[in-house]
Structures are given as C-alpha cells and as structure tokens.
C-alpha cells in the first residue's frame, strides 16, 4: 500500500537514546532556552546533545525542524511533528472516560502521563504558526496534566494554534472550564467536541457511557458561553444516521455560539473495525440524511464540514462542504481511483479501509 507520506522508518543504527529530537545540523542548531530537545541528523557530530542516525529514506521523510521520536527496541524513528505534513496531530493520552463503539484509538490504562510533557516540548521546539491537533484518549481526563501541558506552552513563549479533540465532559466542571480558558488566552484554540445523538439515550448508547450526554451538554454550555471556538463533531453510524437532522436541530436551538458542525465517516480501525458490521451504513445510504442535516445547518447559519468521505460519493450540491481530512501518513488511493479526474480534490481513503468497506464503495461507484 502506497501511503502519501512515510511517517515511520526502520533505521540501521543510531547514537541516540530513546526520546524526542529535533532534526537539525548540529553546527547551526540553537535549542530552546527553556525546554530544549537534542538534535539528530544523518551527519555525525562531536557536539554534546547532537546525535547521528543511519536510516534509508530519512532525508526524504523528514526535514530540518521536524520533531522525531527514536525507539531503539523497535529500531524505528517516527515523525511527531513534520513541516511536510498536511496536518500534525499529537496523542497526549490513551485513557478515556467514554467507550465509543466506533473508537479508532481504543483506550487502555498503560502509564502515559509523560505524553503530555512530550507533546508540550515537541510543540515548543517545532514552533509553527500552523494548527496542531491534540487528541487521545480524552486529553482533559487528567486535568492536572493537561494544565501542565498548557503551562509549558505558555512559559515557553509558544502561541501555536491548537485543535483539541475532547468529549467535553470535563468542562461540566465550571471551575476547570474557567481555568482552561485562562490558560488558553495566549493562543487560538478550536475545541472539537462530539455529539452523536439528539438525546441522552442515543448519545450514551454511541459512547457506551451512561450520563455522558448530560455532562457533554453541560460542558458545551459552559465552554460556549466563554466565547471559545467550538467545532461540533458527529460520527455517522447505523445508530444515528437517521437522526442527523435532529442533532442539527438540538445544536441550533441550544448553542447559538457554536458555528461549525463536522459530519464524519467511520475510520475502520480499532473498535470500529471490530464492530464494523453493526456500525457501518453505506455512504450511499448516509447521504440523503447528511444532505438534510447540511441544509438545515445552512438555514440556521451553522457551517457544515464533511470528513472522511470519498468525493465521488458526495452529492454535487453539498460538495462545497467537503474536506480533504485524512492525514497524509494514513491515507491512500486504491487502484480504482487511478484515472479519476477528481483525485487531486479527494481525500482518498484511510489505509485501514480494506475488505468489506472498500468492496462496498467499489459497488456504489460502479468501478
């Protein structure tokens, strides 16, 4: 499978211990004064905190200024933040207080609190004006560690805009909500918060957690009233696809300060792959309900965005809401996309989109 960009390479050897590094020539590398990371490059150096790596394809996949992670046990170097990436996203935890049946990154209880600090150091040293995504798990589940993450960014003089994916439940605590808003004052943040149902029964079923709907709704209210930027997100499944318009009605009647609704196709990975047969509804069946939701959003002044769909199955009258949303390190174009005139405008498919999912799409587009 040919991915758009290789984000993980196997190396021959390296002098670097496990950890994060800035790809840079040792001779002209200036580490951050408060939160420095060592440098790594194909060329050797006698300079302390400058390391060498022997790795085919390293220069093709990574460029100066990128942040990479070295794992000697796996003999792998992985891109953490890349200047060549269409989107950069950092995982800060694998723990979550929801158990979504369609989760592509199933939660676990492995020790991972170091990821918050690693992410903060990576962002400070990468120092980009482009938006960086923060995801989990649930990034706000460990409130203390999330606050530390934000404090490091602020102390490091960093103002990188962030797109933080959270289930929003932590914001039901109004004191914590106020604390986060204060910590966020030096940067633009877009909070991506999911609402998968128009009532408690449906949303709680989708996330497999009784009481989640009430906390998410309260969190949305608390956060929206502070003037923070919120992108509402709905993953479409067999359980909720016929209620997309109802979700739109709830958002428009309850949250006048939310202006964006992202409607998302499944990523067939993790629990979504395990539960595929009970979750997946064909794109062809989804689209009439998506169109209805989009038109209702438009009437109410709510912007719609369509994520993770093939362009060829998106009706012409709603293609202006289409987004090339799949990260370049996990997207590809199957053979039946070859020769398609719209390929450059299409986001393609997740690399996990194989088997029944892909066969279904092939039948629908009649390739």
Locate each region found by the language model:
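Short, electropositive alpha-helical surface patch
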Residues: 151-154, 242-259, 315-331
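Flexible mid-to-C-terminal extensions adjoining Fe-S/redox cofactors in radical SAM and related proteins
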Residues: 3-7, 315-367
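Distinct, well-ordered alpha-helical segments
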Residues: 144-151, 172-182, 242-251
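Conserved C-terminal portion of the radical SAM core fold
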Residues: 132, 188-191, 214-277, 282-309
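Core AdoMet radical
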Residues: 103-115, 126-142, 156-173, 183-217, ...
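Short Lys/Arg-enriched alpha/beta "domain-start" segment
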Residues: 1-36
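Canonical Radical SAM [4Fe-4S] cluster-binding loop centered on the CxxxCxxC motif
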Residues: 80-117, 343
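N-terminal [4Fe-4S]-dependent radical SAM core
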Residues: 34-36, 40-89, 320-324
